[in-house]
Amino acid sequence: MTLRTKDGLTLYTRRWDVESPRAVICLVHGLGEHSGRYEHVARFFNENGISFAAFDLRGHGRSEGKRGHAEYQQLMDDITLFLQSLDYDCPKILYGHSMGGNLALNYILRYDPDIAGGIISAPFLALPKELPKHLFFILKLLNVVAPSIQLSNGIDPNLISRDREVVEAYVSDPLVHDKISPRFILQSLEAGKWALENADRLRKPILLIHGTADQITSYRASQEFAKRAGELCKFVSYEGFYHEPHNEPEKERVLADMLKWIEG
């Protein structure tokens, strides 16, 4: 199944369905990756009576669009399109990882959508280390003269997981890319900052998870968001985990925590 965006792009979607699901998890994946990397997550939830639906973000995976480039508002609109396409008569849970965590969290805060809640994994609310001033200046300049130019996203595959098989599969995956545009990185950083500043606008329950050894997105920013959001945000910290909790050697523990939260 595919979706057609307002500006004419085709978005690729996937569904892992069970009969009479008690809930459906709606995935927004991270930067440079694609929804196919979550098949094991989908299968886990299927085994527990929960359907799983996903789409490849524009410029990612099997979807159309320039690799690594999008206007932030376009992605918000694409999430709306995706959610509206789902014909389930059961609670929806928005699940976003990394950049997808940034998008999902902003979507929940800005739109208060008709969902039961959200699972937010290692969201890109800020970088672990502040961007050097000269690089920030260059990005702002490029945003004016060449906003969609493809730059390297700087993600070190060795930092996504402590599981070498996961890293090797990521590196060899032809649908994974390492691109990002000046416009998208600046808009995403601004959106992460906005989410932190507006955490008290949270009106839906969320499970926020993050590994303490994440060197790709800021663990401290997640801590701060949880503190500001209050009781609707349950924060679960994983000591020593890298960027992708669902792909760590202890992933069964992470998935069990997600399921427990859903059932609670």
Model-identified regions with their sequence ranges:
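N-terminal cap/lid segment of alpha/beta-hydrolase-fold proteins
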Residues: 1-18
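Active-site glycine-rich loops that stabilize anionic/oxyanionic intermediates
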Residues: 22, 30-33, 212
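Catalytic nucleophile-loop/oxyanion-hole region of alpha/beta-hydrolase
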Residues: 32-34, 61-86, 91
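Conserved alpha/beta-hydrolase
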Residues: 37, 42-66
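Alpha/beta-hydrolase-fold enzymes
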Residues: 97-181
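Short beta-strand/loop motif that positions the catalytic acidic residue
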Residues: 202, 208-210, 214
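Short alpha-helix in the alpha/beta-hydrolase fold that links the catalytic acid
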Residues: 204, 218-227
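Catalytic active-site module of serine/aspartate enzymes centered on a nucleophile-bearing elbow/loop
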Residues: 232-264
